[in-house]
Amino acid sequence: MTKLRLTDPNLSNDDNQHWLTFVALLQDAIAQDLHLPLLQLMLTPDERTALGTRVRIIEELMRGELSQRELKNQLGAGIATITRGSNSLKAAPPQLKSWLEAQLLANKSS
């Protein structure tokens, strides 16, 4: 199995450190069942809605039954948002894609 990259090449060293601090905080919050209040504290309602939409975009892109334009119309998301999701999915490590497929598509009908 390929080792996953811990840092984001699109972020500065400082921003990567801040991101990893947040990820560690979230992991601790999950372990203590505090993840929902933490995310509500850290994210605005619009940001939480946007994350939910991004999950749906990734799910539908992986399902592969709708064009990006159809997906835009169904979800009410901008075409640029869907294109970014598509490009991110293409660049994702294979083990993440497999995990997402199991989490998002297994035992779900369209």
Curated annotation (Swiss-Prot):
GO BP annotations listed: negative regulation of DNA-templated transcription
Subcellular location: Cytoplasm
NCBIfam families: TrpR
UniProt cross-references to SUPFAM superfamilies, sorted A to Z: TrpR-like
Keyword match Transcription regulation: yes
Entry-linked HAMAP family: Trp_repressor (MF_00475)
Entry's family note: Belongs to the TrpR family.
Keyword Signal among record annotations: no
DNA-binding region ranges: 68-91
UniProtKB keywords: Cytoplasm, DNA-binding, Repressor, Transcription, Transcription regulation
Pfam families, per database record: Trp_repressor
Function: This protein is an aporepressor. When complexed with L-tryptophan it binds the operator region of the trp operon (5'-ACTAGT-'3') and prevents the initiation of transcription. The complex also regulates trp repressor biosynthesis by binding to its regulatory region.
Quaternary structure note: Homodimer.
Gene (name only): trpR
Name of the protein described by the UniProt record: Trp operon repressor
One GO cellular component term noted in the UniProt record for this chain: cytoplasm
One example GO MF annotation: DNA-binding transcription factor activity
